[in-house]
């Protein structure tokens, strides 16, 4: 309902909008506008005042809203649509990945290693290397190991996530700080991947990831603002104006708190529908969270297994490429 109301109010262009004799701040004309209204699917122009659309229609009809200070934008026939909504994302995690090492399109183990080596040179010795979003299918399916990156990051801790968020790779420096070794027991709902000698390979799945994630130094308030702004800007550049965020109360990300701070400072430029993990949802009912057209709580997230790419989704039978593994 939150999305629908705001979509209608701010983005969907309705031909039934009442006429407003006030001058518009902006008029967009000579456009190919998709309205989302079954009664008038397309239009040429629309008028905007503040954060609301005054009217939509023909170029000629919008002239009634033109004032001495109205900004006129010629769309040159381009297609215009209401902003897109991302219905499931991890907002702060996404912003963090934009500002850290990029591994999503690494095409080989060598490129994977080189990107981490290059990024390592751009940060100080105390900074953890995070981000990643790697995908082993880009180079044939072999899972990465800590020895891929230990040589280029002997002293800097590295924790890079797989693209689905259900598995990470840590180097030896990070594992040592976390106290994870061959004697570390597996975590319920998670797994430490080990070699033939029982030594961790650097891969940790689902709940076992918390052994590393929980010890990564907390972000400063300034850094959190930078991360959320980076994510927001990337979304807007791709036409996304509203998101459903799955980690509103996550202690490491603090998405709601950060969004609220930016909203108060008038620096929030996307709408966020916040969700809470199943274990945190009681906090939403007890705390005095503000809910308005910019930030609102409204969902709870829980899951029972994992993902296909990380081989953690639960099946009755073994994975075809991982004998003995039925998931978690």
What are these regions (language model features)?
Residues 1-7:
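Bacterial N-terminal signal peptides that target proteins for export
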Residues 13-16:
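C-terminal motif of bacterial Sec signal peptides marking the signal peptidase cleavage site
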């Amino acid at each position: 309902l939150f999305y629908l109301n705001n979509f209608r109010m701010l983005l969907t262009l309705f031909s039934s909008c009442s006429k407003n004799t006030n001058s518009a701040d902006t008029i967009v004309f000579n456009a190919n506008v998709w309205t989302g209204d079954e009664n008038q699917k397309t239009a040429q122009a629309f008028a905007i005042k503040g954060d609301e659309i005054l009217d939509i229609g023909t170029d000629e009809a919008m002239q009634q809203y033109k004032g001495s200070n109205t900004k006129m934008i010629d769309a040159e026939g381009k297609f215009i649509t209401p902003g897109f909504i991302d219905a499931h994302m991890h907002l702060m995690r996404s912003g963090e990945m934009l500002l850290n090492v990029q591994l999503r399109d690494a095409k080989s183990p060598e490129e994977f290693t080189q990107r981490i080596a290059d990024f390592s040179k751009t940060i100080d010795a105390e900074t953890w290397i995070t981000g990643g979003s790697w995908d082993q299918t880009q180079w044939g399916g072999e899972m990465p190991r800590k020895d891929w990156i230990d040589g280029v990051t002997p002293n800097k801790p590295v924790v890079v996530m797989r693209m689905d968020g259900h598995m990470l790779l840590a180097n030896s420096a990070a594992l040592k700080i976390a106290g994870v070794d061959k004697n570390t027991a597996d975590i319920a709902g998670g797994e430490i991947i080990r070699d033939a000698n029982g030594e961790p390979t650097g891969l940790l799945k689902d709940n076992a990831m918390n052994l590393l994630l929980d010890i990564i130094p907390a972000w400063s308030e300034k850094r959190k603002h930078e991360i959320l702004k980076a994510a927001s800007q990337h979304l807007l550049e791709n036409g996304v104006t509203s998101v459903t965020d799955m980690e509103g109360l996550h202690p490491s990300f603090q998405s709601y708190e950060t969004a609220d701070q930016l909203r108060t400072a008038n620096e929030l430029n996307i709408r966020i529908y916040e969700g809470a993990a199943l274990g945190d949802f009681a906090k939403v009912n007890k705390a005095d969270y503000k809910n308005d057209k910019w930030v609102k709580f409204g969902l709870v997230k829980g899951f029972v297994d994992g993902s296909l790419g990380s081989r953690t989704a639960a099946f009755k039978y073994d994975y075809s490429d991982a004998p003995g593994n039925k998931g978690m």
